[in-house]
């Protein structure tokens, strides 16, 4: 059933979708940015029924206020805000946080808009009209792939050229001591490369490793993640020396990698 969602269709979706509530599922906080009052109310009602805490705001000022005073697990942003560009909210949040960002849009549906949103750090892009039950499923997917706030028990560090990726702290550091922020997808993708240096990895393998949805517009999501990683790692992203393309086969990481297991180095 496709909905935008209307009140009638929404009520039907609630009745049919009540089995989507997972036993013992912790209460997660969804922050919605949408200046459509009716849409805000419908999403709040539906997600609340399915064991989510939802805060809905109409603009970036209210968004920033909530974000600074509460723990947020996933952000949903409508691109088509009347007074501002939703992409700016995405850009600003992705630059300083790994909170998953889901974009919803009814007008800006060109491939360029979707690719730009992904490049800026969005986790998902949903076109209106959409299925409210699919919307719920996408939120759950975004929450599953978010890195844990608690530090990982994996104590490995990967050293390559003048970079170090620390798994316990989930940090990418340069030899000079500067930290480069990575989104969850970028982190997972880089780790996949570092665990198998110089092995050609197919796009399907990389999709699984990075936990990116492989459907519709997301067929290009690996290319987008590769581009973003190259921009962060390579001196000249247009002539990459680390992440290289194997034509017709996938990508490979062309560098020596040393692995430290809590102090012990291994090649």
Swiss-Prot record:
Instruction: Show the GO MF annotations.
Output: phosphorelay response regulator activity; transcription cis-regulatory region binding
Report the main location listed first in the record: cytoplasm
* Residues annotated with 4-aspartylphosphate modification: 78
**The Response regulatory domain, residue ranges:** 29-143
User: In terms of domain of life, where is this protein from?
Assistant: Bacteria
Gene Ontology process terms (BP): regulation of DNA-templated transcription
Q: How does it get modified post-translation?
A: Phosphorylated by wide host range (WHR) VirA protein.
Q: Which GO terms describe its cellular component?
A: cytosol; protein-DNA complex
Per the record's keyword annotation, is Lipid metabolism included, yes or no? no
Keyword annotations: Activator, Crown gall tumor, Cytoplasm, DNA-binding, Phosphoprotein, Plasmid, Transcription, Transcription regulation, Two-component regulatory system
Concerning SMART domains, the annotation shows: REC (SM00448), Trans_reg_C (SM00862)
| Residue range(s) of DNA binding per entry | 155-255
Q: Which InterPro entries match?
A: CheY-like_superfamily, OmpR/PhoB-type_DNA-bd, Sig_transdc_resp-reg_C-effctor, Sig_transdc_resp-reg_receiver, WalR-like, WH-like_DNA-bd_sf
Where found, per UniProt? Cytoplasm
In terms of NCBIfam families, this protein maps to: PRK13856.1
What this chain does, per the entry, is described as: VirG is required for the positive regulation of at least two vir loci encoded by the Ti plasmid of A.tumefaciens.
Question: What name appears for this protein in its UniProt entry?
Answer: Regulatory protein VirG
Q: Which organism is it from?
A: Rhizobium radiobacter
